[in-house]
Regions:
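Short, charged, low-complexity loops and linkers
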Residues: 1-6, 158-168, 197-205
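C-terminal catalytic subdomain
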Residues: 178, 197-216
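Long, non-coiled-coil amphipathic alpha-helical linker/lever segments
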Residues: 1-39, 98-113, 192-200
Length: 216
């Protein structure tokens, strides 16, 4: 459910970017390399680039969903159950697309599954972080291409003439934090042999909140 909710949120952002791409396709802006003006471009191209980036990000999310949408029921502590379970039936009843056929792998795959999902979340966060950076930069007096609304900016306690892009700066920081998630999970599960270990419990602390953080 969490993965699907993220996918729906990404799809909504994608459609916003596509609409803006069409709306501003004839509005010129400089194209930059090395932060120096290089060639003519347009805001339509800029919006469209982020829309296409999200399409690629969704491929990672779809792959991660496919890998974790497998029924582990029947693996018990990792070595099978003495109960006569019909694993095919439980897979159908629980709505899984497939099952973990090897009971040891069903348990041993913990950490790997979370890392795959975390990598997909991190790629989405990377796209949004870059978008937020551009918004901050283009809003500055040195560029002045966009004017952020008042509810996305704050003033300064000692410099009242300023409009600081706090919302986009916080978005950038939170997305950069999310990009560290795969590494955190990898290091928690690093050097663990097969079998269950309490180390895996710590993954939940960093993994589960990430969905809401990205949706926010």
């Amino acid at each position: 459910t969490q993965i699907k909710e993220v996918a729906e949120a990404v799809e909504q952002l994608f459609h916003v970017l596509i609409r803006q791409s069409e709306r501003y396709k004839n509005v010129l802006m400089p194209g930059y390399t090395h932060l120096q003006i290089a060639m003519p471009s347009s805001f339509g191209l800029w919006f469209g680039a982020y829309a296409e980036s999200l399409m690629d990000d969704m491929l990672f999310l779809q792959a991660a969903f496919k890998m974790c949408n497998r029924n582990p029921l029947g693996s018990a502590a990792g070595y099978g159950s003495s109960f006569p379970l019909n694993r095919t039936m439980t897979t159908d009843l629980l709505g899984f697309d497939s099952m973990n056929y090897n009971v040891v792998y069903a348990q041993m795959g913990r950490g790997k599954m979370e890392r795959n999902v975390a990598f997909a979340l991190a790629t989405i966060a990377g796209t949004i972080s870059k978008l937020a950076f551009d918004a901050c930069m283009f809003n500055s007096q040195n560029f002045g291409f966009v004017k952020l609304p008042d509810d996305c900016t704050t003033g300064s306690s000692i410099m009242p003439h300023k409009k600081n892009p706090d919302v986009f700066e916080l978005t950038r920081a939170k997305c950069n934090k999310l990009q560290s998630l795969p590494q955190q999970i990898m290091m928690i599960a690093n050097n663990l042999p097969s079998g269950y270990f309490r180390d895996l419990q710590i993954i939940k602390e960093v993994f589960l909140p990430a969905f809401q953080e990205l949706k926010d």
